[in-house]
């Protein structure tokens, strides 16, 4: 009896017969979500991407109080009020330095991740969050606004590390059948973080002049929760196998995350990839940019991350309060209505996580950007005609909520998933460095340039973002392959024709397949290494 017959016999024993195969398949699908896998995703995201989202929105509510703090500190030091231009500059630095810190954190990920691993990188990263929380929370009592600015920078470093290390960790611990859904947890917790920042910023909670420092101090809570919980979970099994060559540790990690004792199939798949890459060192950013086997994967990641930041979602927040005001909503009620935007974000992200393994990455990404372009165009029209009829401002509100929902249902989380899926183990840290650099530089560019675009074009600025969304959707339609339920080798093959170069692991994969069929000895991977060497990858 060959291996396929044994597998079929085992399946029939588990399900009771051929007629119950589909039932057994469904049972195995539900077993993919083990308790340890769920805890790792929730705890990892709560102490990482949640904090990123929280720090995006937390500065909005206390803005007037922080500016008053800056002015008061300046007066005590210099004996005169701060110049308005200087105050604007200080506030711009306070907001935008978060992105600079994120870029620094992204550049640190490869070095830290190589020596510490994915899980330990997340644990060490909590040190940045705790120190930032203490600095920002104590800035008012110390009478030093520089502490708030430095804290924002350190919090940016935390975000840069988190948005690279967390997707890598989730990608490497999840079965490919639920890789997209688990990866979407990153985006869901970003949205929950944004909503939490809006909620805690209400005057009834922490959004008052005497309590605004505590808005920044609560950052310490998710960091402490992650520090207390994550050590009890294993390291990424792929990291243990590829970097530490710890097969026993990798097997235990697979058993923990998959919730079953027999992980021979998963371990063999990882070992097969490990044999191909066993003599390959970690690829540098420059080497990855030069590699012909991944040229279009790199281009796609760059365009995906640039579209993620430049699609105009951040610009929506600049118009929200004015649009709500023109719709007749009292000024003191606008913060409560703004909570609806955070709620829509969270619900749309959860929806995406539920359907991503059914619909795939391509439809959600293309459809999300396409709908954003449509609603940006409609929003431009309603803002231009808002004085023509009393109901037009309400249509603007609908457009804003629709843009947010369209973004979070696809473009808001899929870029992080694709970055992990496109690249093999030795390339993944460099790929996340490239993706993170584009992400944070684009974030900084939007914060720096949007006020000038808004001043020049007014409401027509949304046509710029509509154009970017259309360009992104068009690119993904023609270039992006579906990655749902595909292995790395299959995804590489999907790009091979466009790259005009076969991925180096294909020869070894083919050889190993032939070996299993003919019971031959394991092929040497020297041909693979030669192929990498000829193309200057190693």
Curated annotation (Swiss-Prot):
Cytoplasmic side: 1-34, 110-120, 171-181, 234-297, 357-362, 419-429, 481-538
Transcription found in the keyword field: no
Phosphoserine, modified sites: 3
Regions crossing the membrane: 35-54, 89-109, 121-143, 149-170, 182-200, 212-233, 298-319, 334-356, 363-385, 391-418, 430-453, 459-480
GO molecular function: D-glucose transmembrane transporter activity; urate transmembrane transporter activity
Pfam families associated with the record: Sugar_tr
Mutant phenotype after disruption: Conditional knockout mice lacking Slc2a9 in enterocytes are born at the expected Mendelian rate; they show no obvious phenotype and are fertile. Mice however develop impaired enterocyte uric acid transport kinetics, hyperuricaemia, hyperuricosuria, spontaneous hypertension, dyslipidaemia and elevated body fat.
Main location (coarse class): membrane
Catalysed conversion reaction: urate(out) = urate(in)
Outcome recorded upon mutating residue 71 to Q: Decreased N-glycosylation
Swiss-Prot/TrEMBL keywords: Cell membrane, Glycoprotein, Membrane, Phosphoprotein, Transmembrane, Transmembrane helix
GO biological processes: D-glucose transmembrane transport; urate metabolic process; urate transport
Cellular component, GO annotation: apical plasma membrane; basolateral plasma membrane; nuclear envelope; plasma membrane
Keyword Disulfide bond: no
PANTHER family in UniProt: SOLUTE CARRIER FAMILY 2, SOLUTE CARRIER FAMILY 2, FACILITATED GLUCOSE TRANSPORTER MEMBER 9
Protein name: Solute carrier family 2, facilitated glucose transporter member 9
Native source species: Mus musculus
